[in-house]
């Protein structure tokens, strides 16, 4: 078993005692850091950065050089899986990700391969191995994937969407086609996450960014059901240590009880959910991650500290809290404010772990 100098993130996910509340930030390797922008310029474009193991490792480590974060997260993108299925991912300036061949019907789904994680997605595994080597056991490495539903939204819509009318049309007019796609994605994501774990990821997270656009019943059928399948198929132990899994549905605060039944170790919360209420509802079943509004990092330092104190008090005493933002850090946040946030979590949380 690889010795970890700082394992408080893994311990908190498993609701074990820690000295202070662990903290990391979604998108902590990103455009708010000038050093990230420099490395990205060196790579040429976003996907070239993802596909170069040394550069992906460099940007993964950049935030850890600045801040005493308790975890590193693999630098990659949720759309690596659909890209490996041959949909032709490209990025349009100001438009975000697009696909040249969106999925329109059951026949399109039938043609999609289930990618081999060590072949078509080998560059991700190389990045995981490189990052693990360079971390030298300082902090754990988080691997991740998008959820089947969230990946399907991009694949069917052909890119980002505001109203999700194309995929909802498929969901209501041709549910069989959508279920076939989600099933294939669940198998692909299970293989992909297990390969990340074998390559060295010490925890994994499933990002269900668009689950919150569904009705409760549709969320159960088209999103949660497939995340549950993935959780059931994941390697839960590797290198002599439990591998915790976190589910995060943005806008999913009303479904926490159902999410906690999947067998995951932790639930990510966005900033619209009250953490005290969330803890009351899930009890000791799962750990909770979150959940400061990322926009709070625009506030003066004293206000950031006040918000950190309020969220810590909301969760209260005891184990099972990983502090994070409620979604990714914004690209124009002053890096010093992120530093205030991280330092405040450690300093102000000590009293809750005595």
Swiss-Prot record:
Known catalysed reaction(s)?
A: uroporphyrinogen III + 4 H(+) = coproporphyrinogen III + 4 CO2
UniProt: substrate binding residues: 27-31, 46, 77, 154, 209, 327
Q: Where in the cell is it found?
A: Cytoplasm
Q: Which GO terms describe its molecular function?
A: uroporphyrinogen decarboxylase activity
| One GO location term (cellular component) | cytosol
Q: Which GO terms describe its biological process?
A: protoporphyrinogen IX biosynthetic process from glutamate
Entry EC no(s): 4.1.1.37
Show which residues form the site (Transition state stabilizer).
77
CDD domains recorded: URO-D
Q: Which domain of life is it from?
A: Bacteria
Q: Which PROSITE patterns match?
A: UROD_1, UROD_2
Pathway assigned to this chain's UniProt record = Porphyrin-containing compound metabolism; protoporphyrin-IX biosynthesis; coproporphyrinogen-III from 5-aminolevulinate: step 4/4
Top-tier EC class: lyase
Q: Which UniProt keywords apply?
A: Cytoplasm, Decarboxylase, Lyase, Porphyrin biosynthesis
Q: Matching SUPFAM superfamilies, A to Z?
A: UROD/MetE-like (SSF51726)
Main location class: cytoplasm
The Swiss-Prot or TrEMBL record describes its family as follows: Belongs to the uroporphyrinogen decarboxylase family.
Task: Read off the NCBIfam families from this record.
Answer: hemE
- Which purpose does this protein serve, as stated in its record? Catalyzes the decarboxylation of four acetate groups of uroporphyrinogen-III to yield coproporphyrinogen-III.
Q: How does it assemble?
A: Homodimer.
Q: What is this protein called?
A: Uroporphyrinogen decarboxylase
The species this protein was found in = Escherichia coli O6:H1 (strain CFT073 / ATCC 700928 / UPEC)
